[in-house]
């Protein structure tokens, strides 16, 4: 497994998230874009809190990014919104809304920043353990990119599953149904032809 670290202290000068086009891209932007552009359907991007484990099995690539989760999410969402190749589905831990600011100082501000960074996209919630297991089980067949952030807050990772940008699940379901119907019709015609010949 490949592991790349980006240590850019001057990144601290770049403020929070937001999609202002006049902002200078962060130092890690080009590498993250290149990695994201290589992904396709059924791949995952995990924008992870700082304690997220480095997985030793193949299929998982970890990059340490000198940024906070909302900043990285904002950048990746901006990039994916320009893509015609893939469509993202966003997932967060079901536990996140229940973490109190008393026990995890800064979590209230984090939730506000994350909501902004997701640009109004629909977000599904699952148990954190289930999300981690699901994404890692897919890693046995498909690539998972982990962007490990500096964020030190519980349940703050964002799991992004990629689907086709030009062929959605509804289109795939309809295609499969049409194929089944056509094959069934052909079988029925063959049966009728055989009965006629006998």
Please give the residue ranges for each predicted region.
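Sec-dependent signal peptide recognition
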Residues: 1-9
């Amino acid at each position: 497994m490949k592991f790349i670290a980006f240590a850019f202290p001057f990144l601290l000068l770049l403020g929070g998230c937001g999609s202002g086009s006049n902002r200078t891209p962060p130092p890690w932007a080009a590498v993250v874009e290149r990695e994201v552009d290589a992904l396709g359907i059924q791949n995952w991007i995990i924008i992870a809190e700082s304690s997220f484990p480095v997985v030793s099995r193949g299929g998982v690539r970890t990059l340490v990014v000198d940024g906070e989760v909302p900043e990285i999410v904002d950048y990746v969402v901006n990039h994916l919104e320009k893509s015609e190749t893939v469509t993202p589905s966003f997932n967060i831990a079901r536990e996140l809304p229940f973490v109190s600011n008393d026990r995890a100082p800064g979590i209230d501000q984090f939730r506000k920043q994350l909501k902004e960074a997701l640009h109004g996209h629909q977000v599904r919630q699952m148990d954190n353990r289930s999300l981690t297991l699901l994404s890692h089980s897919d890693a046995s067949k498909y690539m998972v990119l982990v962007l490990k952030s500096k964020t030190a807050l519980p349940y703050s990772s964002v799991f992004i599953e990629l689907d086709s940008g030009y062929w959605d699940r509804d289109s795939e379901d309809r295609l499969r149904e049409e194929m089944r119907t056509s094959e069934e019709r052909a079988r029925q015609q063959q049966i009728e032809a055989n009965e006629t010949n006998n």
